[in-house]
């Protein structure tokens, strides 16, 4: 089904606004994926804040022109699904995890921080823990010396308390 000019402009405007807010774009070929599998992928993506779209490549190229994702315009050929996310790793994680279980989804590349990523770059990005996990790990590292000091002081107080009880 072909789109008229106003519908094409609406699609371009929508994708342009997605690209302006997003940190990451992941591009994957979806040839041969069943509707049920594609629905699972979309539900998983939506739950993680990733916007997945199947777009005409010419419209996608126009939408990302002048943005940080312009570096992957040459990769936009064939039947592709585009994943935009505001979280730096969410789109890569969703697509890479799905590609592990479904060999028909082929990651073609992506972009992050204005740089084009190849397949290995997307997979490496997917292996990075999420922002929340990294913040939790940082808090744990910061709390570790404090909690160790508290344990040592508690042990000293208990030992001193035993010494006073034995003297009495």
Swiss-Prot record:
The family this protein is said to belong to: Belongs to the universal ribosomal protein uL10 family.
Function of the molecule: Forms part of the ribosomal stalk, playing a central role in the interaction of the ribosome with GTP-bound translation factors.
Gene3D superfamilies: 3.30.70.1730, 6.10.250.290
UniProt-recorded name of the protein: Large ribosomal subunit protein uL10
A biological process from GO: translation
GO cellular component: large ribosomal subunit
One GO MF term: large ribosomal subunit rRNA binding
Cited InterPro entries: Ribosomal_uL10, Ribosomal_uL10-like_sf, Ribosomal_uL10_bac, Ribosomal_uL10_bac_type, Ribosomal_uL10_CS_bac
Assigned keywords, A-Z: Ribonucleoprotein, Ribosomal protein, RNA-binding, rRNA-binding
Pfam families attached to this UniProt entry: Ribosomal_L10 (PF00466)
Keyword rRNA-binding applies: yes
Subunit record text: Part of the ribosomal stalk of the 50S ribosomal subunit. The N-terminus interacts with L11 and the large rRNA to form the base of the stalk. The C-terminus forms an elongated spine to which L12 dimers bind in a sequential fashion forming a multimeric L10(L12)X complex.
């Amino acid at each position: 089904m072909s789109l008229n000019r106003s519908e094409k402009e609406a699609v371009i405007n929508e994708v342009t606004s997605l690209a302006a807010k997003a940190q990451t774009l992941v591009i994957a070929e979806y040839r041969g994926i069943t509707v049920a599998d594609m629905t699972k992928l979309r539900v998983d993506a939506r739950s993680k804040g990733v916007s997945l779209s199947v777009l005409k490549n010419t419209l996608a190229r126009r939408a990302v022109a002048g943005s940080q994702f312009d570096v992957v315009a040459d990769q936009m050929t064939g039947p592709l699904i585009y994943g935009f996310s505001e979280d730096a790793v969410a789109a890569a994680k969703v697509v890479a995890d799905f590609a592990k279980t479904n060999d028909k989804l082929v990651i073609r590349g992506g972009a992050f921080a204005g740089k084009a990523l190849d397949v290995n770059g997307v997979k490496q990005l997917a292996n990075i823990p999420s922002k929340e996990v990294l913040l939790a790990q940082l808090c744990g590292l910061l709390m570790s010396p404090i909690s160790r000091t508290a344990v040592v002081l508690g042990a000293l107080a208990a030992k001193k308390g035993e010494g006073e009880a034995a003297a009495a």
